Amino acid sequence: MTTTTETETTGPKHELAQVNIARLRFPLDSPQLKDFVDGLDPVNAVADAAEGFVWRLRSDSGNATDVPVFGDDWLIVNMSVWRDADALTGFMYAGQHRELLKRRREWFAHTREAMSALWWVPAGERPTVADAEERLLHLREHCLLYTS
């Protein structure tokens, strides 16, 4: 089942934007985060080549670890756009990304507020960090989170 919206004559009308932010447990240049930092470029290269990948947020550094979010230096942001949910899921739970995902509790603090969001954007539109912050604030205000 495909989860994108499209028409036969014009192709996709919308693409799936995703954001996730994480609160660092240690400074990015610390030995505790070395494996995470060393994994960024290889995982981003896999994402860039993945079926259904459209775009990802990056700064001049090539990733987004230095892009400010919510004015908090301990938060890092990952934001991307995908053809559909199937493409995003296929990347998230496979290969190198899956291996890093398994270790997230070593590197990032547990939080009790929304740290990720998905939403549809018109095809060709690229969300901003302000868009992502707005989505996360909306979820935090209107959604009950169950945490363990």
Give, region by region, the residue ranges found by the protein language model:
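N-terminal "first-domain core" detector
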Residues: E6-V43
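Extended, composition-driven regions rather than compact fold-specific motifs
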Residues: L16, S30, D73, L137-R140
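Short, well-ordered beta-strand segments in beta-rich or mixed alpha/beta enzyme
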Residues: Q18-A22, V67-M92
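Short amphipathic alpha-helical segments
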Residues: S30-R58, G95-R104
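Glycine-rich loop/turn
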Residues: E51-L75
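An amphipathic, aromatic/His-enriched active-site/gating alpha helix that lines ligand/cofactor pockets
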Residues: D72, A85-A114
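A contiguous, mid-protein "functional segment" used to position or interact
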Residues: R103-C143
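Conserved small/polar residues in nucleotide/adenosyl-binding loops
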Residues: Y146-T147
